[in-house]
Amino acid sequence: MALPGTIVQIMWAACLRCGLGVCLVWGGFWGFASEPSSAASADFNQPTIQSLLQNHCVSCHGGVKKRGGFSVVSLEPMLGKGDSDVPILVPGKPEASLLWHRVQTEDVSQRMPPEDQPPLTTEEVHLMERWIQEGAHWPLHWAFEPPKPGSQRSSQLHPVDARILEVLNQKGMEPSEPAAPTVLLRRLYLDLTGLLPSSDQWSRHLDMLSRGDVHSVVDQILASPHFGERWARHWLDQARYADSLGYEKDSVKKDAWQYRDWVVQAFNADIPFDRFSALQLAGDLIDPENPQALLATKIHLQTQFNLEGGIDAEEDRVKRVIDRVNMVGATWLGITVGCAQCHDHPYDPFSQSDYYHLMAFFNNVDEEASFLHRVPDEAQLESVMMERRRLQDQLETMLQRQLTDKSLNNQVVGQLVKLFQYDQNKGLTRHMRERSQQRRATHVLIRGDFRRPNLALGNMEPAVPAIGKFLPSPPNHVDRRFLAEWLFSENHPLTARVFINKVWGHLLGQPLVETPQDFGSRAQEPVHRELLDWMSSWWMDQGRWSLKELIRMIVTSKTYQQSSNHRPHLSQVDPQNRFFARQNRFRVEAEVLRDIALQMSGLLDLRIGGPAVFPPMPEVVIQQSYSRYHHPSQGGDRYRRGLYTFFRRTAPDPNLMVFDCPDASASQALRGSSNNPLQALAILNNEVFHEAAQSLAQRLWNDSDLKTDHQRLTRLFEWGFGRAPSEKEADMILPLLAATRAYTGEHPDQLSALQASDLSEMDQASERAAWVALARLILNLDAFITRE
């Protein structure tokens, strides 16, 4: 419901005068965290031969085109002759190398790069000559080298801070001052639980922070059951989780939520990341009798399913397998393996054959339905199985009756329908299972077309790609268990780095490696590479792959705890804050924004787990879906956390999407953070935020201890920010309240736009309406929607 125009004008004019700013107005002076640059725009100004070849040669001699019959993606293809009789590269002999002749010839028709491409500079030509003369050494890409722990640092410094400070000192920079205790506590709660501290937590934990007991505060927050919800949302972005199947029909996945709940429980239990990952990759092989292990494999069922008429079932199956391969590459390897589906990777040493060897791990996996849901003990499991056997016996009896007595046909058919509609939520769920018979052959698909298998290359057996020099000896029988073991081998160069980079991005506002889903040869080496390598080595060894230990290590550092305040000098020397001389300031995610608004208003239902719920959604969006099914939940379900909101792929909640929620079509490592006018309008006019503002105003009026405007304003700030408003803030906001109060008193016809029906019957309705308007403004403040 929209606010009356005049009230909006009063509220915004006052905000502009006071400088508090709503989401639409500037988003704060320093703004949001810098967006990671794309792989295509990575900086290759380093004086290396690889960057020279990537910049000038790979477009014609990469994994796609391979003109002249050779590629410059790696050294080996250049050591042959390609389509010519002259070797492309002869280490130590530039004069015998075709590559050298082509870059330095005066013949324009022969010179490379061609005329329509930027030419090599004199320095670059000399670099290539010197490189060949010195033996054509090809250094390994930094991300393909195993992490090195580096040298020991002073034990007096936090290990994260010691490595950050070393780089800052080299650059002549200093870290920022510590954040205010209220800012730090709010930051910790938003980062670790996605919620605000309660009144008791504000009081108790601020007292602990004042005594310097940060570790105990962190431990208590990590122990919250809401930790699992917060970090499950991050993981579900990578798992491309949704509650519907996609495509035109976009039918409901009735059991999708069971995987989501498994992830929440796994993070709360702090299952080590290697075990957490292995169960998702191969739970049906690792522990086939364990219902929880089978539930974990539902990550592979987050693909889209096409239920349209007339489709080719095999084409749809292959698309799902390909989606799983690409998800594994993005989530665990941080490599764009999908580029090799149709041809060799354009710029990474990852061939098309490598892709289909990887695909072979998943090509013999089928979906299976079993009774798995909520079976905490053997007694309940046996009860479910007995019921299943009873129903099977009943079904067989009815079938026999149907065969012998035609007069019972209608009755039997009706009974059969009832049996087949047996409540699926009582245990039946889909999961993955490796097929043991009639196994499918995996072939390289020409141009990625499932109808064009390259039979000449033979069957692609399951195999892992060589990453750098890391290629362990496979066992006799290779399956998804080996894939999981390979990913978490001691010397694997990517798995720990890739995940830690994303965790750092969630906690510091931007990752150490700017391309979190592409650690390939175009990924810039991070300025804090030694920190990334040290954390990777520490996490695998001492941290035991524990997510909570990793988070504890980061958030107890001074680097995490420093202020995010703007510093003019830093904006000149490090505008993107790549060196982390300050914290980053950014808008909270879509779900968190809704959650904290409902929490502050007292409406938020904090129940954990269960089927998806249906908050109010615009009818015009509902009509976009094929089924047009969306009946708003009632009672507490209407105000559950955003994690539990039903997500339909073809008609997602626009209030999620306007705040950069991913569309679940592909794995998303880190969300973007945009700033646009629609966001302010969504908060101002969305039905849920309107109800939150009404409830927040009512919550203030229900507190009999609050007698004055200043006391109520103070309580608002205490709930939202853990502090009282400053004198300047109060002087700016209270006149706004007075102006709104005067307007509502003079225009009683507009009270219904601000009040719930129960409020309109109260005395002093215009007074309460003014507080509803102010509550809506507070929920739209940049300070409220921003994590500092």
Model regions and ranges:
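Primarily short, surface-exposed interaction patches in extracytoplasmic proteins
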Residues: 155-186, 191-192, 196-226, 241-288, ...
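Solvent-exposed helix-loop boundary motif
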Residues: 32-166, 182-187, 197-202, 244-245, ...
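Bacterial N-terminal signal peptides
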Residues: 13-31
